[in-house]
Amino acid sequence: MILKRILFLFTSVTLLAGCSSGRAPEIRAICLRDDIGNYIIKWETDPHTDGMMKLYVSDTPNSFDMSRPCSYADINDGRVTYITNDNITRKYFLLSFNDKYYRTVGARSVQMDSVQNLRDIGGYFSEHGNRMTGWGKIFSSGELKALSRNDTIRLDNLKIKTVIDLR
């Protein structure tokens, strides 16, 4: 009888420990721009996570006003759209999953009138997943000549300090 109770207790503790491992879910997120400049943010969690996703927006990737989410979504929806009329200032987004797990994203491609393929190389994790290239720190692009007025403003807003032409 005592052996049965010990076995039951051991089995219960083992099962409960497995269910509440506390392991953070892997969060994969991407930010895209639609044809009119709105931001579409998509995400997946592994393992599957239920609850609420809060979306915060900022002009910089490291400073978000956590008292004012701009949007809410059910985590299971897997997407939210941020509507903007500002196609000059670049936006970054902080996704908060149940106020416990966080992921910062931005649109990788920067919309320009006369520059092809200007991309933010931030947001990539190291091989072991413990370090990430900072958003808004390194960009790649095609030629930067003959910029339109809006492109000049957009580049100024990116606060690029050094341009290296590798051609």
Predicted regions and their residues:
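Positively charged n-region of N-terminal signal peptides that target proteins for export
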Residues: 1-5
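Sec-dependent N-terminal signal peptides
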Residues: 6-15
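Cys-dependent protein tyrosine phosphatase-like superfamily
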Residues: 19-167
